[in-house]
């Protein structure tokens, strides 16, 4: 955690210094006032933390643990018509005792005109509604499984966890204002390396990702997204049955596996999305489809998934109730598959994972909230499909 502590100290020191509107120095009993430039005064320091308890009774993988889900520290600023952001993250994503610190956002965006904005650097990919949603605002124990696997988090291709981000350039804008000034159409399109955060392009080919949506009434948006590109080097595995003849000349099979690196692994994906968000009511659903091989070649070259959820106020600004249904099919099939050789050794793969979730979100203040959640999970890749999960989170912003 030394790296995280050092980075936090540096950012805190910067924030303290930039919030001073004047610097005064006394020399020879004379006081000199130095005006701080406007771009320096515009810099803001913020962040948030997510503390988690999670328990599950999954057979063979029971757990009951506290966890530091996420910590982020952010500098935002403005220089003329440009906004910029730098964000670092600390997380235990690798597991207890293995904290990681990494740069997740570093970009500048020209925002002079709402119809045409240009962003360059490292930032969220222009794919799906859920991807760019703040993890606390999102309101659940985690992003939907299909988002994690097909939107650049812990991607199907084996890409390192990138929080849905990549390095590139994006154009976006909002068009066609109505009589009230509310704009009815949004577009966004970006060109990216295709390798995730803090990584150069490994095959000199780029990912192109874009989306559009319409906003016919206040709070409602309906959209579609597309993604085509490659991952430069994809480490893959493949299990298969090899035939042979034994000493009695009887045909037998034995289970084998092979590791290989796929060059320029294709990613062709699309998504359909709908969302209504107004007066603390939030409803959202998305369907995602992927064509292209993943890091496990036994899964085939297709995957898909969807989710739908609702969050409604029980006590306005104080207590919300929520429910979510989600499904991810890692090989676009419902049931798992099994390879069994002549000696009875087997390899199981594929199948759908479905979750039914309910919970409550309680707001102590605007910047402090608790999330409670119960999930019933059906994972058909497991011998015992059904298990339960309980998740409690304390989330804060500053």
Residue ranges and their predicted role:
Residues 32-194, 202-209, 213-222, 309-313, ...:
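Outer membrane beta-barrel
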Residues 23, 58-60, 107, 111, ...:
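Outer-membrane beta-barrel pore domains
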Residues 51, 125, 198, 227, ...:
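Short, electropositive, low-hydrophobicity segments enriched in small/polar residues
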Residues 190-198, 234-236, 240:
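Active-site-proximal beta-alpha loop/turn segments in soluble metabolic enzymes
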Residues 1-50:
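N-terminal periplasmic/intermembrane-space "pro-region" immediately following the signal or transit peptide
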Residues 199-205, 265-267:
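Interfacial loop-to-helix transition and helix-capping segments at the boundaries
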Residues 14-15, 82, 336:
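Hydrophobic alpha-helical membrane context
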Residues 158, 199, 261:
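Charge-dense, low-complexity intrinsically disordered segments
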């Amino acid at each position: 955690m030394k790296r995280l502590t050092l980075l936090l100290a540096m950012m805190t020191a910067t924030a303290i210094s930039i919030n001073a509107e004047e610097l005064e120095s006394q020399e020879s009993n004379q006081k000199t006032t130095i005006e701080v430039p406007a771009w320096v005064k515009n810099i803001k320091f913020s962040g948030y933390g997510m503390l988690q308890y999670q328990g599950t009774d999954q057979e063979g993988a029971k757990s009951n643990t506290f966890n530091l889900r996420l910590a982020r520290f952010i500098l935002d600023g403005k220089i003329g018509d440009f906004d910029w952001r730098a964000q670092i993250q600390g997380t235990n994503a690798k597991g207890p005792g293995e904290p990681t610190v990494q740069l997740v956002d570093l970009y500048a965006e020209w925002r002079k005109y709402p119809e045409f904005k240009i962003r360059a650097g490292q930032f969220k990919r222009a794919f799906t509604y859920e991807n760019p949603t703040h993890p606390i605002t999102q309101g659940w124990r985690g992003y939907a499984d299909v988002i994690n696997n097909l939107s650049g988090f812990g991607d199907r291709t084996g890409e390192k966890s990138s929080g849905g981000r990549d390095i590139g350039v994006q154009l976006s804008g909002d068009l066609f204002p109505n009589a009230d000034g509310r704009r009815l159409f949004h577009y966004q399109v970006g060109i990216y390396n295709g390798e995730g955060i803090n990584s150069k392009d490994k095959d000199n080919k780029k990912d192109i990702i874009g989306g559009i949506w319409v906003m016919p009434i206040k709070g409602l948006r309906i959209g579609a997204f597309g993604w085509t590109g490659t991952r430069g080097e994809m480490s893959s595995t493949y299990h298969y049955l090899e035939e042979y003849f034994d000493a009695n000349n009887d045909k037998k099979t034995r289970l084998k596996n092979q590791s290989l690196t796929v060059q320029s692994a294709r990613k062709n994906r699309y998504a359909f999305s709908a969302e209504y968000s107004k007066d603390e009511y939030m409803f959202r659903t998305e369907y995602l489809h992927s064509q292209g091989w993943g890091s496990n070649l036994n899964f085939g070259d297709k995957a898909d998934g969807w989710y739908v959820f609702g969050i409604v106020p029980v006590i306005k600004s104080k207590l919300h109730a929520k429910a979510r249904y989600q499904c991810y099919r890692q090989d676009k099939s419902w049931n798992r598959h099994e390879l069994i050789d002549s000696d009875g050794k087997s390899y199981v793969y594929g199948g759908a994972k479905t979750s039914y979730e309910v919970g409550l979100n309680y707001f102590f203040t605007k910047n402090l909230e608790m999330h409670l959640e119960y999930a019933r999970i059906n994972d058909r890749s497991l011998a015992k499909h059904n298990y339960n999960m309980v998740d409690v989170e304390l989330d804060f912003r500053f």
